[in-house]
Every structure is written in C-alpha cells, then in structure tokens.
Amino acid sequence: MARRKNHSIKIENNEKENQILVSLSIVALLGGCSEEQVQRDVYQSLDDCLADWKKIELCEADKNTESTQKTATTQQQGLGLNIRDNGNAESAVKNPAENNAQANQSENRAESTTKAESTDPSLGAAIAGGVIGYMAARAISSFLGPSYHPGNRAVTTPTGQVVQPQTNRSVGKPMLVKGNAGSMNSKPVSRGGFSSPNKTHRSSGG
C-alpha cells in the first residue's frame, strides 16, 4: 500500500511540473509576440527615402541628426547676421543718400507684394509653409523608413494600402528596433503565425 501511495504522489508531481512547463512556454511565446523585433532602413536624404517608399509620411527624420544640424545651423546663422549687420552699418555711414533710395524701393516692393497676396492670403501662406517645410526636410542628411519585419520589407497604411518597395536606396545595415512595432502612419505586414490575413475562397461554378 505504501508503494502505491508513493507511486501516485510521484505521478501527481510530474503532472504539476509538466503543467508549469507548458504555462511557462505559453508565456514566453506571448512575450515574443508583444516584443516584436522590427527594422528600419536608413537613408542619406529625403529623396532617397521617397524613391523607395513613395509616400512622405512613411519617411521620418532621424532625431539625433536633426538636433545636431539645428545647433550647427543656428551658430552659422548667428555669425552671418553679425557680418551682415557690420556691413550695413558701414555702408549707411558712407552712402546715406543711396540707402534712402534703396529703402524707398524696398517699401514699394513690399506694398505691391502685399496687394498681390491680399486676394487670398491663406492660400499663399499654406503654399509658402509647405515649400519651407519640404526644403527644411531636404536639408536634413539622415532619414528613417517605416518599421518592417526582417525578411518582409512591406508595410500597410491606415487606409489598408500595402507598400512594398521595388528598390533599395538605403545606406548601411537597417536599424533594429525592439518593442511596439509600427507608427501612426504604417504597420509592418504580418509574417504569419501570430495573425493571418483573411482569405476569400472562390468556388468554381459547374
């Protein structure tokens, strides 16, 4: 009787250990799904990124490079302003009559420009803002493409459109990103296994 009890206790312990192992495996798998590893292409310019992904909302400026360039540009602009101010001060002392004539001409030009833009100022401001934004983006020397799964260089937009580049103008190796995959503008196309796309089967009519 004692042997039978010991045998049954061992079986129960083995079953509990197996249940614990199975539950740990499930937790590990779920953790792997939530902490997906994706990658992003690195580009030297906005034009290169657009050549691959076709949509400007899929290209993002590298924040590290952008902050560094802004600091350098601000310093250069400060030096340039000091030089121009000194030059203007010297010319004002030398040629006061010429400066007055130039000032009158610039005022007339400003008035004519204001009259021309007064018909639709909002449109002019929108166009100017868009052009300035695009030119500022082109001045940045490092851009990142959207996040995608290794081995499947494709993303989906919020409207459901799948974008898969046919070219690759990125430089170096893609940047690996861990954690929450995707952004507001795109999501990586599923590799299969965790979520499968809906498939429609068409029946052939006889």
Curated annotation (Swiss-Prot):
Composition bias, Polar residues: 66-79, 182-198
Compositional bias of kind Low complexity: 97-107, 155-167
Residue segments, region Disordered: 64-123, 155-206
Comp. bias intervals (Basic and acidic residues): 108-118
Descriptive protein name: Uncharacterized protein HI_0930
